Amino acid sequence: MPSVYGFPAFTSATELLLAVTTFCLGFWVVRVTRTWVPKGLKSPPGPWGLPFIGHVLTLGKNPHLSLTKLSQQYGDVLQIRIGSTPVVVLSGLNTIKQALVKQGDDFKGRPDLYSFTLIANGQSMTFNPDSGPLWAARRRLAQNALKSFSIASDPTLASSCYLEEHVSKEAEYLISKFQKLMAEVGHFDPFKYLVVSVANVICAICFGRRYDHDDQELLSIVNLSNEFGEVTGSGYPADFIPILRYLPNSSLDAFKDLNKKFYSFMKKLIKEHYRTFEKGHIRDITDSLIEHCQDRRLDENANVQLSDDKVITIVFDLFGAGFDTITTAISWSLMYLVTNPRIQRKIQEELDTVIGRDRQPRLSDRPQLPYLEAFILETFRHSSFVPFTIPHSTIRDTSLNGFYIPKGHCVFVNQWQVNHDQELWGDPNEFRPERFLTSSGTLDKHLSEKVILFGLGKRKCIGETIGRLEVFLFLAILLQQMEFNVSPGEKVDMTPAYGLTLKHARCEHFQVQMRSSGPQHLQA
């Protein structure tokens, strides 16, 4: 019944408790969603979320699709909540370029997420929230080391660079292995062999060694990496809802265990390098970093001091940059080839015309193979197997498209949306490499720059350059000599499963045929 003061009167303690609870929830929602906004700016729009969990249910099993749909309603800059944490989501090519490139200093941070502290003991350059001068100097050091032992020329090599030498050896191994599997079984799953070959390339660059494909030590790395991607696929609400860290969570426990094992493995290999290190005889990236570390210790004025642990974490980051993304790219490429035999034939016709069958493809052939490049770009775009960049954060108060974004805000960058934007691509769901070619058959560089897979700006993937080159060379060598298909009557499932990278279902029904003319093993 009404009270004498015009407010509702409560007839029981239960009603009173319910009213107080409702008021508190309402106050909490207003509190967590309200931010002071400078005059002339607006808060990013977005849907209302549920108390305590925010938009966790809205994201669902395919966050890239859910957030793309929301961007169609709310625009290129929108805001959601995960738990009580506000997250700004960026879509649209121009908006993302504005944020990560033109305003790159504002958006170069990483959010201080709990799961990030578990990777490389919280010292990873890739995942660490630090974005200051020391981080920038270490990143340049890592980039230079990677360049020196991958794409820089070396007159002592028969190949143009270390990367070409390592990829050529592994591609030749795969050709022999696939032939053997066809003779013995008649079909196979290429992923289980690709992943080991790609791991061998980055092992050679980082550690100066190649493993046999049945080596248990190498297989342990491969298995850890596969498990890492599977475990991270479920995401970590504990990053945004702290109480979940203290509740039983099998995925979180597995994530912790995998990171400890991977870090221990890296530490073991690097300790071995310290033990066998000889100044003036630099074998690989790890030796290069050890030399830098020792030289800087003698120079008190050096601006980049490296501890032994920092050497481990840099190698950790470089290994990660050159492994999962490349394996996934080649694997998706093979899936598109067997489902589009016309495209496979066109690539092989181009290889025959430009290179022939008397020698092996080289990195220097890349500019003369525009259709193969167009195919790779379309694979990157259509699969968008890295749907989001690693989350960014703002390091200062800033604005974007008229919307105010405070310092320390977590920022998601939806690469999948850009690669499937109908305004950019017209028919984004069609797999059509020709879209990247001009009327004269050359590569359309302007359009190719609109594909986003490796991020942009100050935090873009450190392994982008070698990744693109490695995918190109593996495919060129394999397709020059072999034709890929699947067993008659079998279908491939290209439905992507969400994770750290989008993965297709494994297919055990691949077949290869050596191409009808030309030697099987060509001169490099």
From Swiss-Prot:
Gene3D superfamilies, sorted: Cytochrome P450
Induction annotation: By 3-methylcholanthrene (3MC) and beta-naphthoflavone (BNF).
Residue ranges, annotated region (Mitochondrial targeting signal): 33-44
Key words of the record: Cytoplasm, Endoplasmic reticulum, Glycoprotein, Heme, Iron, Lipid biosynthesis, Lipid metabolism, Lyase, Membrane, Metal-binding, Microsome, Mitochondrion, Mitochondrion inner membrane, Monooxygenase, Oxidoreductase, Steroid biosynthesis
Pfam name, any one: p450
Domain of life: Eukaryota
InterPro entries referenced in this protein's UniProt entry, alphabetically: Cyt_P450, Cyt_P450_CS, Cyt_P450_E_grp-I, Cyt_P450_E_grp-I_CYP1, Cyt_P450_sf
CDD domains linked to this entry: CYP1A (cd20676)
Role played: A cytochrome P450 monooxygenase involved in the metabolism of various endogenous substrates, including fatty acids, steroid hormones and vitamins. Mechanistically, uses molecular oxygen inserting one oxygen atom into a substrate, and reducing the second into a water molecule, with two electrons provided by NADPH via cytochrome P450 reductase (CPR; NADPH-ferrihemoprotein reductase). Catalyzes the hydroxylation of carbon-hydrogen bonds.
Descriptive protein name: Cytochrome P450 1A1
Source species of the chain: Rattus norvegicus (Rat)
